[in-house]
C-alpha cells in the first residue's frame, strides 16, 4: 500500500526519518510507501520565519536548501535590516540578528543598513511612519524620528556631542549603539517671566517684583554646546540681575529710576 500527499504551489514538503530531513517535495501529488513511511513537514512559502530549531538544522546539514528556499537574515553588530514583503516594510531587524525566512519568489527582500551612519535612510523613515491597517512596523523603536516645525531648529546630540542644527522638516536616526538626543528650539522672539521675586532694597525695604524679558537665540548651536539647559541659565541670570539692580539701591533711588 502507498500513501498519497498533495503539495500546493505555495508549499514544500520536507521528508524526514528519525528527525533527519533528506528530501524536498514540490507542488503536485506524491506517493509514499505505507511501510516505513517518512514524516512529512508541510511548509508554506509565505515569508514566515523558519523556527529556530529547524533553521539551525538546515544551516548545518542542508545548506543547499537554505540557499534555494530561504532568505538569510544574518546581520553584523553594526547592521540593521529592513525586511520587505511586496515592497511593504514588515520589520526592522536589530544588529546581530540571525534568522531564516521562507522565500516568496522574489517578493521577500532584505535591505542591510549600517547603523554607524546614524541618520536613517529617507525611504526607510517614510515606510516606518506610513499609516497601515495592521499596526506599526515591528522593531520601529530602534528609530528616533524628529519633526522640526517652521521657525524652529533641532538640536541633535549623538553620544553627548552636539551636532549640526536640524532645519525644519522630518528626519530619523538610529538609536542602536548610540545615545541620540534631540531638542526642538523656537528661534522666534519669546517672553520669559520671572515672577514673585522678594528682594530687600539697600535700605531694607522688602519688595515683591515681577520681571518680563523679551529674548531670542542669537546662536543656538553655541548656546547648546556650552549649556545643558540655556533657558534655565537665562532665568537664573535674570534673577541675579534683578537682585543686583534692586539690592544695591534704596527705595527712593528705584522710584526715581522707574
Model-derived segments and spans:
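N-terminal hydrophobic membrane-entry segments
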Residues: 1-258
